[in-house]
Amino acid sequence: MSDMHEVRQALLTGERAEFQASGKRYIDTIFDDGESPLKHAHDIELKSSSFKWKYPLWYCSDILAKDCTWFEMARAGVWYTNTIRVEDCTFEAPKNFRRCHDVALRNVDFVNAEETLWACSNVSLENVSARGDYLAMNCSDIKAYNLRLVGNYPFDGARNIEITNSRLISKDCFWNCENVTVRDSFISGEYLAWNSRNVTFENCTIESLQGLCYVDN
């Protein structure tokens, strides 16, 4: 991607400021007021940049974001987007990542993870910290390593889940799920994995009131 057009230290405002952008690298750039600044963008790199308003990355593809921040009003930040890599970033806004495919998050902090990662597929989480309810609802094919979660009802309705070396402080975790494997992890919370199928825990510590009810395998 060396032939990318670079945008440095820009302050971008207004609705759809960079609509359908392609082959661009944004460095130290602020996406300020104005909805959907990168709607329908593809082949984009974002470095040390920030989003301050709603819907920044909708219907996008081939996105790389490093050292970026989604501030509190950058709600519903990444929806309907395919092939996105996010590293060393902070999300203050809720409801990020919905109906996305091929999502890789590494060293990411979700300050408010409420309703985040809904209906996404092919998801990789590495060194992710999240605080908020209803994480990863109805996701499929999700792998997490060193996930640190404080929040209730995660992974409701999800399938094909692998979690390793993680810590989940979560009530009603893994409800209505299918094909769940958790290894080398700590889970604390009531009513674990109700109404689920094919659930496996290996070398885990579990603290749960009325856990594993109505489980098939």
Per-segment meaning from a language model:
Residues M1-N217:
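Long, distal/terminal scaffolding or interaction modules
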